Amino acid sequence: MYDPERRWSLSFAGCGFLGFYHVGATLCLSERAPHLLRDARTFFGCSAGALHAVTFVCSLPLGRIMEILMDLVRKARSRNIGTLHPFFNINKCIRDGLQESLPDNVHQVISGKVHISLTRVSDGENVLVSEFHSKDEVVDALVCSCFIPLFSGLIPPSFRGERYVDGGVSDNVPVLDAKTTITVSPFYGEHDICPKVKSTNFFHVNITNLSLRLCTGNLQLLTRALFPSDVKVMGELCYQGYLDAFRFLEENGICNGPQRSLSLSLVAPEACLENGKLVGDKVPVSLCFTDENIWETLSPELSTALSEAIKDREGYLSKVCNLLPVRILSYIMLPCSLPVESAIAAVHRLVTWLPDIQDDIQWLQWATSQVCARMTMCLLPSTRSRASKDDHRMLKHGHHPSPHKPQGNSAGL
């Protein structure tokens, strides 16, 4: 139960391209209950949630945040196979966007205020980073927090000489005190601010602190998190986040001033429209609200920013390339064009990788040796007992084994 005397924290779940949801939820809180954000002790974030927490604390304009998210979606959808295309480098997109948009004193603004969830590669443990000494450190930490193994690349980036990957691998909804932390997630589950669905299905799972209801709606959302849909569909997540945050405020009696009740309309119905037809308990990513009056309660600022971000800024060449006959032809030519594009992308990445190639190769050698050693210990128990005896003998003579772990700069190849 909400206690107005407490200072609350907020935790934003990692969600890939679904970060639009966090934008809508935060805007609702800032308009309807600004004291929650103004007096917040800490902002926690993982992956896209960490990106949102940093941009919010830095007071980036809403229009700029929407522009960054929409540009990232457009880049991901600009190729035939989307985010899997070799020309799409999500690490570079995130790094370039952060370097361009974040203020130079971002490390001073967010230190002690924002906790970024990372997963340390060496032991798989979760690490919360909250102190930064430069803008580059903030960018490195955010790139590490967004690095999905294999999907984002083969070699993990580094932060302060240590390799890290997506914080969602170990803790996707980081909290220090669950009783005083408001959790925000775009997935159907049991978090404070998240989509709700009326259904007889009560099954849900908890994966690295992320609560997921077992429903087709979450399956679609998980797919959209890695393979974004059209910009209009992704933009609608802002409205979903805004309404879910409003429902949370209403249920806990936090709203400033009298507000119109939305409790009957904010819960997604058991049957939603898909292509004009009712489909069981399926809740698609495209929102299905039954009360048109809901839209009157939405923030004019959000509606304006979203409409502006969705506007088509493509030139005539892009419009021609998006014509159905041209797209069909491009798919037919894909078996021939993809190998050539892959070779070009590989050469380009190799050239940009050259400054870090020595450190990264050393790390790959160390990682390979660790994997081989663990496999050997699992397959040959005698080796495990012999290694234990050797360690005991070394400790007895005052020696402490310390495996060599070369560290390098961020790579993300």
UniProtKB/Swiss-Prot annotation:
<dbReference type="GO" id="GO:0003841">
    <property type="term" value="F:1-acylglycerol-3-phosphate O-acyltransferase activity"/>
</dbReference>
<keyword id="KW-0808">Transferase</keyword>
<dbReference type="GO" id="GO:0005811">
    <property type="term" value="C:lipid droplet"/>
</dbReference>
<dbReference type="GO" id="GO:0035727">
    <property type="term" value="F:lysophosphatidic acid binding"/>
</dbReference>
<comment type="pathway">
    <text>Phospholipid metabolism.</text>
</comment>
<feature type="glycosylation site" description="N-linked (GlcNAc...) asparagine">
    <location>
        <position position="209"/>
    </location>
</feature>
<feature type="topological domain" description="Cytoplasmic">
    <location>
        <begin position="1"/>
        <end position="42"/>
    </location>
</feature>
<feature type="active site" description="Nucleophile">
    <location>
        <position position="47"/>
    </location>
</feature>
<protein>
    <recommendedName>
        <fullName>1-acylglycerol-3-phosphate O-acyltransferase Pnpla3</fullName>
        <ecNumber>2.3.1.51</ecNumber>
        <ecNumber>3.1.1.4</ecNumber>
        <ecNumber>3.1.1.3</ecNumber>
    </recommendedName>
</protein>
<feature type="active site" description="Proton acceptor">
    <location>
        <position position="166"/>
    </location>
</feature>
<dbReference type="InterPro" id="IPR016035">
    <property type="entry name" value="Acyl_Trfase/lysoPLipase"/>
</dbReference>
<dbReference type="GO" id="GO:0016020">
    <property type="term" value="C:membrane"/>
</dbReference>
<dbReference type="GO" id="GO:0006650">
    <property type="term" value="P:glycerophospholipid metabolic process"/>
</dbReference>
<feature type="topological domain" description="Lumenal">
    <location>
        <begin position="64"/>
        <end position="413"/>
    </location>
</feature>
<keyword id="KW-0012">Acyltransferase</keyword>
<dbReference type="GO" id="GO:0002021">
    <property type="term" value="P:response to dietary excess"/>
</dbReference>
<keyword id="KW-1133">Transmembrane helix</keyword>
<feature type="short sequence motif" description="GXSXG">
    <location>
        <begin position="45"/>
        <end position="49"/>
    </location>
</feature>
<comment type="pathway">
    <text>Glycerolipid metabolism.</text>
</comment>
<feature type="domain" description="PNPLA">
    <location>
        <begin position="10"/>
        <end position="179"/>
    </location>
</feature>
<keyword id="KW-0472">Membrane</keyword>
<dbReference type="InterPro" id="IPR039185">
    <property type="entry name" value="Pat_PNPLA3"/>
</dbReference>
<keyword id="KW-0443">Lipid metabolism</keyword>
<dbReference type="GO" id="GO:0042171">
    <property type="term" value="F:lysophosphatidic acid acyltransferase activity"/>
</dbReference>
<dbReference type="GO" id="GO:0004806">
    <property type="term" value="F:triacylglycerol lipase activity"/>
</dbReference>
<feature type="region of interest" description="Disordered">
    <location>
        <begin position="389"/>
        <end position="413"/>
    </location>
</feature>
<comment type="function">
    <text>Specifically catalyzes coenzyme A (CoA)-dependent acylation of 1-acyl-sn-glycerol 3-phosphate (2-lysophosphatidic acid/LPA) to generate phosphatidic acid (PA), an important metabolic intermediate and precursor for both triglycerides and glycerophospholipids. Does not esterify other lysophospholipids. Acyl donors are long chain (at least C16) fatty acyl-CoAs: arachidonoyl-CoA, linoleoyl-CoA, oleoyl-CoA and at a lesser extent palmitoyl-CoA.</text>
</comment>
<dbReference type="GO" id="GO:0036042">
    <property type="term" value="F:long-chain fatty acyl-CoA binding"/>
</dbReference>
<keyword id="KW-0735">Signal-anchor</keyword>
<keyword id="KW-0325">Glycoprotein</keyword>
<dbReference type="GO" id="GO:0001676">
    <property type="term" value="P:long-chain fatty acid metabolic process"/>
</dbReference>
<keyword id="KW-0551">Lipid droplet</keyword>
<dbReference type="InterPro" id="IPR002641">
    <property type="entry name" value="PNPLA_dom"/>
</dbReference>
<feature type="transmembrane region" description="Helical; Signal-anchor for type II membrane protein">
    <location>
        <begin position="43"/>
        <end position="63"/>
    </location>
</feature>
<feature type="compositionally biased region" description="Basic residues">
    <location>
        <begin position="394"/>
        <end position="403"/>
    </location>
</feature>
<keyword id="KW-1208">Phospholipid metabolism</keyword>
<dbReference type="InterPro" id="IPR033562">
    <property type="entry name" value="PLPL"/>
</dbReference>
<dbReference type="GO" id="GO:0004623">
    <property type="term" value="F:phospholipase A2 activity"/>
</dbReference>
<keyword id="KW-0444">Lipid biosynthesis</keyword>
<dbReference type="GO" id="GO:0019433">
    <property type="term" value="P:triglyceride catabolic process"/>
</dbReference>
<dbReference type="GO" id="GO:0019432">
    <property type="term" value="P:triglyceride biosynthetic process"/>
</dbReference>
<keyword id="KW-0594">Phospholipid biosynthesis</keyword>
